[in-house]
């Protein structure tokens, strides 16, 4: 039986003329949880919580800006003939996670250089929190009925009906047609990556490997899920941008892992350089 219940209202709360959307609440919750977990892990590894908070203060807005630039660049035809301010109308939708990651990585490189800390250590600390935030954030797409796949077959519908709760079936049924809940596929995949990264940390891998594993595993999932989506950005009208970027990230990350395993001695649990210097000084004083 086709699900025809009314979809979830995108507006969670209305206070006078002010509307607060579920999308914003979900994204904010994911971001706050990610920041909290990253700060706790930084503290455990000997970095100050203030350092991570300072990084987040720069990384979050820059990541959002890059996410928008990335989207506008590949959808420029939408904005070329329209009013110029539409380029900045982020509230109307149009951001891309790959753009956000690029912005975050650039911020981390510059931040690490200025604050004299290891870029790879920051990246390793942030990676599990980032993928968890992405897993949560996809539920914002669910409420908005966006970033979904194409229509499903009757056989797939019957299979989904046995396992998926009604609220997902209802929300993914748009104008009488049910679509692939690609938000759910990616959210579940991201949670599995999160668990995998937590397990990887326990084995004290080479510094940078947690982040690079995040980059590889997320890109693998994104490559296949992107093939189902109906709202993909395209390069030259024939190549799905996210799939091309995913392949590029996988190749580069594998090369980095191989290179760093041969040339780098620092491990995930090693104290940051500043702490090592302090420990050496304290040892000399004791002598």
Swiss-Prot record:
PROSITE patterns: LGT. One of its GO terms (molecular function) is phosphatidylglycerol-prolipoprotein diacylglyceryl transferase activity. One of its GO terms (biological process) is lipoprotein biosynthetic process. Keywords: Cell membrane, Membrane, Transferase, Transmembrane, Transmembrane helix. Its main location: membrane. A 1,2-diacyl-sn-glycero-3-phospho-(1'-sn-glycerol) binds at residue 138. The lineage of its organism: Bacteria, Bacillati, Bacillota, Bacilli, Bacillales. It comes from the Bacteria. Pathway: Protein modification; lipoprotein biosynthesis (diacylglyceryl transfer). One of its GO terms (cellular component) is plasma membrane. This is Phosphatidylglycerol--prolipoprotein diacylglyceryl transferase. InterPro entries: Lgt. Its EC number is 2.5.1.145. The chain crosses the membrane at residues 15-35, 55-75, 90-110, 117-137, 180-200, 238-258. It is found in: Cell membrane. Catalyzes the transfer of the diacylglyceryl group from phosphatidylglycerol to the sulfhydryl group of the N-terminal cysteine of a prolipoprotein, the first step in the formation of mature lipoproteins. It is a multi-pass membrane protein.
């Amino acid at each position: 039986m086709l699900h025809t219940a009314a979809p979830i209202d995108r507006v969670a709360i209305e206070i006078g003329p002010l509307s607060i959307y579920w999308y914003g609440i979900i994204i904010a919750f994911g971001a706050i949880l990610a920041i909290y977990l990253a700060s706790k892990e930084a503290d455990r590894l000997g970095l100050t919580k203030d350092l991570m908070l300072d990084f987040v203060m720069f990384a979050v807005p820059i990541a959002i800006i890059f996410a928008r630039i990335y989207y506008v660049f590949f959808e420029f035809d939408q904005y070329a003939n329209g009013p110029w301010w539409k380029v900045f109308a982020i509230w109307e939708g149009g951001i891309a996670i790959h753009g956000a990651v690029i912005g975050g990585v650039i911020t981390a490189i510059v931040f690490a250089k200025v604050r004299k800390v290891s870029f790879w250590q920051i990246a390793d600390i942030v990676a599990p929190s980032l993928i968890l935030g992405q897993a949560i954030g996809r539920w914002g797409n669910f409420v908005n009925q966006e970033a979904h796949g194409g229509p499903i077959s009757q056989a797939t519908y019957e299979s989904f009906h046995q396992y998926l709760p009604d609220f997902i079936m209802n929300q993914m049924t748009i104008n009488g047609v049910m679509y692939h809940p690609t938000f759910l596929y990616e959210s579940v995949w991201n949670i599995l990556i999160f668990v995998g990264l937590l397990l990887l940390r326990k084995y004290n891998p080479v510094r940078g490997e947690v982040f690079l594993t995040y980059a590889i595993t997320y890109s693998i999932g994104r490559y296949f899920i992107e093939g189902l989506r109906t709202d993909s950005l395209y390069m030259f009208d024939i190549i799905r941008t996210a799939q091309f970027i995913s392949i590029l990230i996988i190749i580069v990350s594998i090369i980095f892992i191989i290179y760093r395993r041969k040339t780098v001695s620092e491990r995930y649990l090693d104290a940051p350089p500043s702490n090592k210097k302090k420990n050496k000084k304290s040892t000399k004083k004791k002598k």
